[in-house]
Amino acid sequence: MTTLRKLLLVGALLGAGAGVGTALFALVTPGEERKQAMLKEMPEQYPQRRDEAARTKELLLATLQEAAATQENVAWRKNWMSGGGGGGGGGGRSA
């Protein structure tokens, strides 16, 4: 009998916790108008930011393609933007 009582109590507490969690989630979730406003404020909406992101992706892809085509460890370069073997020796570490 006490086991049944404990199980019912645990079930009631879990149900109450789930109810409180659901209520809090409903309170903090933005409405449809706020969602639309947030989407308009996204950085990708601005052409300059879009172009900058596209350029960054192009540079990353070019670096990955170069790294795949060479045996050099491009991560050790002092200037990643420069091509060729400009590692400089030592990878920028000093004793």
From Swiss-Prot:
One example GO MF annotation: phosphatidic acid binding
Region feature (Mediates lipid-binding): 23-80
Pfam family, one: UQCC3
Chain ranges on the Mitochondrial matrix side, renumbered to this chain: 1-7
InterPro entries for this protein: UQCC3
One GO CC annotation: mitochondrial inner membrane
Subcellular location: Mitochondrion inner membrane
Any one of the GO BP annotations: mitochondrial respiratory chain complex III assembly
PANTHER family referenced in this protein's UniProt entry, alphabetically: UBIQUINOL-CYTOCHROME-C REDUCTASE COMPLEX ASSEMBLY FACTOR 3 (PTHR36465:SF1)
Purpose: Required for the assembly of the ubiquinol-cytochrome c reductase complex (mitochondrial respiratory chain complex III or cytochrome b-c1 complex), mediating cytochrome b recruitment and probably stabilization within the complex. Thereby, plays an important role in ATP production by mitochondria. Cardiolipin-binding protein, it may also control the cardiolipin composition of mitochondria membranes and their morphology.
Protein name, per record: Ubiquinol-cytochrome-c reductase complex assembly factor 3
